[in-house]
Amino acid sequence: QVAAVLGNVVVVVPTVVLLSLGISLALGHPMISEKEAEYTLHSLSLLGPTLLFAAFTGCLLFASSIVAGWAENWFVLQRLDSAMRYNPRITGLLGTARADRWAHFMRHNISGFASNISLGFMLGLIPAFTAFFGLPLEVRHVTLSAGQLAAAAASYGLPALTMPALWWAVAAIPLVGALNLCVSFYLAYQLALRAHNVSGVQRSHIHTAIRQRLLRKPFSFLIPG
């Protein structure tokens, strides 16, 4: 997950900057106005409620994983891979070999599709729903926040490097990523303990083992073995 987050950020930031520069050259104005850039920097600032929103977004990430698990279980329970593989209409349209490849592909990727689609809907719709009810609740996903930050910085150009607001927003990005992952993993961990009926004594042993691993090999939580 750490590698995935870093990979997303490393790709998103230069892509957004290049896209903004391309729009500036083609249309004569940046992708977002300076007023919008100023709002973006202040909304992402470490001095604001960004970390609270990041923790809330971690809950949404956990919810999307629940949707993914449900979708995969439903796919397997209904034997949809077999239906795709042997359905006469599908095999007639795609051919036997291609239908088999599609069935295999969907069996191994249905959870990813369900997770990404449900997360996209939640990230886009929940702030609108909460705003309708007067709740100023927003989302702070590390990849989206990094892209917004890059767009705001590109709007100002090189003078952005002298702006304190930019660096307060930059400082928030790693913490946003950490909260996204930690909150979602914590909720998943608690669910796993309940699902397996892990007793209090067993939980204490697990917590002790985690603490010992954290003290002895802290980087093993960040770098794949």
What are these regions (language model features)?
Residues 3-20, 115-131:
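Hydrophobic alpha-helical membrane-insertion segments
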Residues 5, 9, 50-70, 117, ...:
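Hydrophobic transmembrane alpha-helical segments of multi-pass transport and channel proteins
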Residues 2, 10-94, 136-155:
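Catalytic or ion-translocation cores adjacent to nucleophile or general acid/base/metal-coordination motifs
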Residues 77-225:
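Long, compositionally biased intrinsically disordered regions
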